[in-house]
Amino acid sequence: MINLRKTHPLMKIINHSFIDLPTPSNTSAWWNFGSLLGVCLIIQILTGFFLAMHYTSDTLTAFSSVAHICRDVNYGWLVRNLHANGASMFFMCLFLHVGRGIYYGSYLYKETWNIGVILLLTVMATAFVGYVLPWGQMSFWGATVITNLLSAIPYIGTSLAEWIWGGFAVDKATLTRFFAFHFILPFIITALAIVHLLFLHETGSNNPSGINPDADKIPFHPYYTIKDALGLMLLLLILLLLALFSPDSLGDPDNFSPANPLNTPPHIKPEWYFLFAYAILRSIPNKLGGVLALLASILVLLVIPFLHTANQRSMMFRPVSQTLFWILTANLITLTWIGGQPVEQPFIIIGQLASMLYFLLILVLMPLAGLFENYMLKPKW
């Protein structure tokens, strides 16, 4: 009997990707976040689709259309809360996924890693334009502050900012095009995610030890499908707890007020998942310098594969690198906290020190730790 799963042109692709895929037998729960990100993307596309049915991208009606969704549309409040908190879950999974990649040396699959960094940037762009759509105070002023950064680019900056705005300030044209971007970008993310998987399946998955796992592989189904299902249940549990019990805890109270260009909020700040980058941006008292640091904070991920100096791939057996990794984690949490604080002492100096340490750890200390560990592992007799 012919097995359709292995012969049908379409089923064959699914089979090789999710069923008969040879997978290392020792990958831990840290390898769950790829599938969870896929689920997050599906949730965001579905909830976003239903929100788009009722949303109007016009400055006069955008805010009231969001209120209408929450008050008058059947389960509109739930769809909106799932979408808003789904974004937070998306970024939580993203940060853990990237952290896993750094810890276990997965970045040495350069193509997969580079596509991943492009994916991260695209998701960040999508979240930014999406945050502008409710047209609350923080939506408007966040859009104004961030798009204004383009004007720091020498010579073409001002023209570029006005081109993005579609006028001389953030207004109706900006909101309309941001809605268009927010609708199209998730599909671009889906395409990039498929390419990400394509490159990953060229090499096969990494594993916690960092050693070539070819000698000991197991089929993806049922072992990892059941493991991913457990991760999915936990993700949905946390998302539902957030969306049903404290849907506004991660948002900004200022966004409950309609956008007013004549009234600036006392503290303009983005959503929590951008605060680390926002802190790095603010730590440099120069507009262009801040913009470059902001870009570098994400693009620095692209140089990590070229700075790998250790003889071992994973940090599993490298205590010095492990220590630096957890210092980097603590540093990012510190930056996130600083990004949400007002621009005054002692927050300014803490932010500047944390920003310096961020780049120092990735570009200097971690490569040096790799060399030091190589030296320590050499026989001394």
UniProtKB/Swiss-Prot annotation:
Cofactor(s) of this protein: heme b
One GO process term, biological-process aspect: mitochondrial electron transport, ubiquinol to cytochrome c
Transmembrane segments: 33-53, 77-98, 113-133, 178-198, 226-246, 288-308, 320-340, 347-367
Co-factor binding details: Binds 2 heme b groups non-covalently.
MF (Gene Ontology): metal ion binding; ubiquinol-cytochrome-c reductase activity
One Pfam family per UniProt: Cytochrom_B_C
Annotated binding of a ubiquinone, by residue: H201
SUPFAM superfamilies (alphabetical): a domain/subunit of cytochrome bc1 complex (Ubiquinol-cytochrome c reductase), Transmembrane di-heme cytochromes
GO CC terms, sorted: mitochondrial inner membrane; respiratory chain complex III
Keywords, comma-separated and alphabetical: Electron transport, Heme, Iron, Membrane, Metal-binding, Mitochondrion, Mitochondrion inner membrane, Respiratory chain, Transmembrane, Transmembrane helix, Transport, Ubiquinone
Positions annotated to bind heme b b566: H97, H196
Residues reported to bind heme b b562: H83, H182
Annotated Gene3D superfamilies: Cytochrome Bc1 Complex, Chain C
Its membrane topology: Multi-pass membrane protein
Protein localization: Mitochondrion inner membrane
Superkingdom of origin organism: Eukaryota
Known role: Component of the ubiquinol-cytochrome c reductase complex (complex III or cytochrome b-c1 complex) that is part of the mitochondrial respiratory chain. The b-c1 complex mediates electron transfer from ubiquinol to cytochrome c. Contributes to the generation of a proton gradient across the mitochondrial membrane that is then used for ATP synthesis.
Extra remark beyond the main annotation: Heme 1 (or BL or b562) is low-potential and absorbs at about 562 nm, and heme 2 (or BH or b566) is high-potential and absorbs at about 566 nm.
Family recorded in the similarity comment: Belongs to the cytochrome b family.
Name of the molecule in the record: Cytochrome b
Gene: MT-CYB
